[in-house]
Amino acid sequence: KLTEFKDDYLRLTNHWSFNDYIGFEVGLVSHQRKAVVESFYKLFNYPSKYVSVAPAVALELLPWGKKGSIFKIDYEKGWKNLLGSNIDYERVEADAQTIFQASRRQSYSIRLGAGFYTRKGDHWDFVDYTNFHDDNIPGGWNDSWSGEFELLPSQWYNASDYYIRGNFTYEAPMIATAWLPLIGKYIEAERLYVSSLVVNHLHPYTEWGYGVTTRAITLGIFAAFKNTKFNGIGCRFGFELFRDW
C-alpha cells in the first residue's frame, strides 16, 4: 500500500447539440490523488497529494445522425496553481465508434482511438486519459465489454505519453456454444472480442475474448497478451434479468 493513492475524480461538462450531426462540449476535469500512506512520501520529501484541474473542450461529429457512427476530438489543458492544481499538461485525443448491423441479430462493434500529450509538466503521469472513461456511441454498446480492455490495469495507459487503440466485437445468435445440445437452446447471443493497444512498453497489448448471453446472465472469458506473450486469463459476469425493464 505504500505506493497506492486514493483518487477523487470530478468532471463538469456542458454539452450542446447544434443539430443531429454536430455537438460541442465545454467543461472542467479534476483529479485529486492522495497517498494512502502519506508519511512514506513525506519521508523522502515527495508530495503526498497530486491535483490536476483542466479546462476541456470537445467536438462531436455524427455524419449519419444520432443512430450512426460518432467521431470525437477532445482537448484538455491543465494549469498549475489553478484551484490548487500542482500538475500542468496539454493533451489531445481522438475517438471513433460505430455499430454496423449486418442483420437484425448480427452486428459488428468497432472502436478506434488515439491520444498524446503536447505538453508534459511535473507529475503529468498522475492524469487519466478521457477516452478510457467515456463511451460516446449513441445508445451505448450492445453489451458491457465492447470497446473496453477487461484485463489491463489502467496505469499501463495512463502513464504513457501516447496510445493507439482498437476494439472489435462480432455478435451473432449462433457462433459456437449455441450449436451444442442441451445448453444451446438457452443461448440468446454469442460474441467474439478482439482488442489491441499500443503504449509505452507495450507493442502491442492484445485481448481475445468470447462471451455468451442468456435471458438471465452474460458470461465472458478473456485472454491477455503483452508484447505477444501470454499474460493471463480472466472471466466476467453480468445479470440480464432486468434488461428489458
Labelled PLM ranges:
Residues 178-187:
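Short helix/loop segment immediately N-terminal to the Walker
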Residues 4-10, 47-55, 86-92, 106, ...:
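Residues that define the transmembrane beta-barrel architecture of outer-membrane proteins
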Residues 1, 64-177:
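C-terminal outer-membrane beta-barrel translocator/porin domains of Gram-negative envelope proteins
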Residues 18-24, 66-71, 90, 104-110, ...:
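Outer-envelope beta-barrel architecture signal
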Residues 20-26, 34, 62-69, 102-108, ...:
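Repeated loop/turn-to-beta-strand initiation elements of outer-membrane beta-barrel proteins
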Residues 12-16, 28, 57-61, 94-98, ...:
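Residues on the lipid-exposed face of transmembrane beta-strands in outer-membrane beta-barrel proteins
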Residues 1-17, 31-46, 110-153, 221-245:
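Outer-membrane beta-barrel translocator/channel fold
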